[in-house]
Regions:
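Hydrophobic ligand-binding cavity/cleft-lining segments
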Residues: 1-50, 146
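Short Gly/Pro-enriched turn/cap motifs at secondary-structure boundaries
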Residues: 7-8, 60-61, 85-88
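Intrinsic-disorder/low-complexity, polar/charged segments enriched in Ser/Thr/Lys/Arg/Asp/Glu/Gln
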Residues: 10-18, 54, 67, 80, ...
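Short beta-edge strand/loop motif at the mouth of beta-sheet-based domains
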Residues: 14, 34-69, 75-80
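Hydrophobic/aromatic beta-strand elements that line small-molecule binding cavities or substrate pockets
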Residues: 15-17, 43, 68-74, 85, ...
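Short strand-connecting beta-turns/loops that link adjacent beta-strands
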Residues: 22, 50, 77-78, 88, ...
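Hydrophobic pocket/interface hotspot
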Residues: 26-30, 36, 55-57, 72, ...
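Beta-strand/loop substructures that line and gate deep hydrophobic ligand-binding cavities in soluble
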Residues: 86-139
Length: 148
């Protein structure tokens, strides 16, 4: 959804997958930043654990890419982790939620990104970016589900 009153145009993208593992197993892999490259394409991540910890990611192929700095703004094991993107390229929030389903889980990943664009351009960019981003998140979550 695009907010026409804001100078930065927000973009919300969500994907979800069923995982045949209990919430603690999902949480452990989800917050093992050093393993994110196993399920998120073209990404290397390192960082701490817990509220206020810093997480740093590199998204790209070879030398072409960008650094994504984040601060953990919510930490509620094994259910919810929110990171605040603070870099120059990516700003907004990444929300990772684990929903218990019996002895298994649903893993929902939402990105609320602040596009540095005027509202009209943000709306147009959202039409282009959203389906690509949704497919990327969904593909990553399918890989994640196979790892646990």
């Amino acid at each position: 959804m695009t907010d026409v009153s804001s100078p930065a145009s927000p973009l919300r993208v969500t994907a979800q997958v069923h995982v045949r593992a209990d919430p603690h197993q999902v949480w452990d892999l989800m917050t093992d930043w050093s393993r994110q490259h196993e399920w998120i394409w073209a990404t290397q991540v390192r960082g701490g654990q817990g509220l206020g910890a810093t997480v740093v990611g590199w998204t790209g192929v070879g030398p072409v890419g960008f650094t994504d700095t984040m601060i953990i703004s919510e930490w509620d094991p094994p259910l919810r982790c929110v990171v605040r993107h603070t870099g120059r390229v990516v700003r907004g929030s990444g929300i990772f939620e684990v929903i218990p389903v019996g002895t298994e889980s649903e893993f929902r990943w939402t990105e609320e990104l602040e596009l540095p664009l005027p509202p009209a351009m943000g709306k147009l960019a959202g039409l282009v970016i959203r389906p690509i981003a949704e497919q990327g998140l969904a593909a990553s979550l399918r890989r994640f589900a196979r790892l646990v």
